């Protein structure tokens, strides 16, 4: 199914600053393409340092009034944003599919509705937030207030462009902050279209959207003296740079980074549930998910039962046109990512790994214009293998046989990452014991890759700092102020 791109996407986009689309300080633009077809979708402005200065100054000015709005006012505006997102769900979902390559069934069911729900959720969180008063003694009391930090500088990755933006924007503005946010230069279009909703609902300057290269304007955002809080979703390598910028400027940072998560299948697992959960863990969004269950640890008693079922399941996945409602896996987001995946397949072939399913780029039936890859299952001898240690970020699953629960825990923890993981078992006590022992920020039991609001998401170790997607995330964007009152009017004397 082909659509008229201009029904969804403008030919050119400026920078969204102070509630308007404006020209950048440079005439340079970046071409944005559809990874499934190679078609040019739009051209975006390539922001420069001067544009970052402009956006931050606007955000600082807007903060003066926005931070004084009531919680109920902010909550209503967040609800309005969520409502308008849902009213335009089909359009924005199609933009996300065209720009990212993911199936329309996912963008319609997950990306856009969950983004809308985050605005609704944080509207309720801020509306019900309460401070505290503590009577220290009969004459003194301590009041605790939660106040906005100021200007938030955020950059989000290309794998969930709109959803990740909502994870940042909703709590930031709910808390009374303003924000300067930059999407990936390859997948900015959904957020730029949603800027029109911000234009309708929010005061000018509360949300500002820059487009450009992460190494240029993204880096300038994180190193700007006028930015009071950093928030980043992306690779661990870039996360180090953001952490360094935060340390240099002595500002807080929320970092959601890479992962190499273990999905553990115990010998008492419901295999139907496990097969579905394994596919959700590694094939959702073409495997371009930081929390992907990319290491499969299977109990030796069921290994020979489970692997053939997975081989069959992987071979039956429909990979193809992302606009087709029947498509289960679309295109990888770009050539660089496809080449990275292929390099790991090549490494597997040159090692003692065994490719059990997939392992090839798909080029038939018109897929040669895009970056399509087969669901791939690879058996590796142990967890020290390159494919078991490094984040591939694609539909490539390594499978390792384990003899018992403790070995599964040990292997799961033998990683520099600690973002997520899964356990499949009919014995909830057994599953909980493993979940508690695995050092990750999120563990799913008998499911995988469910990402609703109301459940904290974030990682241990090199997977990041901080948690998002739950009410505690509001504190990422707040300062705590204590007001200490003495009502005695009595002289205390020097200590």
UniProtKB/Swiss-Prot annotation:
Q: What is its EC number?
A: 1.2.1.3
Q: Which SUPFAM superfamilies match?
A: ALDH-like
Q: What class of enzyme is it?
A: oxidoreductase
Catalytic residues as annotated in Swiss-Prot or TrEMBL: 256, 290
The record's listing under InterPro entries reads:
Ald_DH/histidinol_DH, Ald_DH_C, Ald_DH_CS_CYS, Ald_DH_CS_GLU, Ald_DH_N, Aldehyde_DH_dom
Reactions catalysed, as given in the entry? an aldehyde + NAD(+) + H2O = a carboxylate + NADH + 2 H(+)
Alphabetical keyword list = NAD, Oxidoreductase
Residues involved in NAD(+) binding? 212-218
GO MF annotation list: aldehyde dehydrogenase (NAD+) activity
Family under the similarity heading:
Belongs to the aldehyde dehydrogenase family.
Protein name in UniProt: Putative aldehyde dehydrogenase AldA
Protein source organism: Staphylococcus aureus (strain MSSA476)
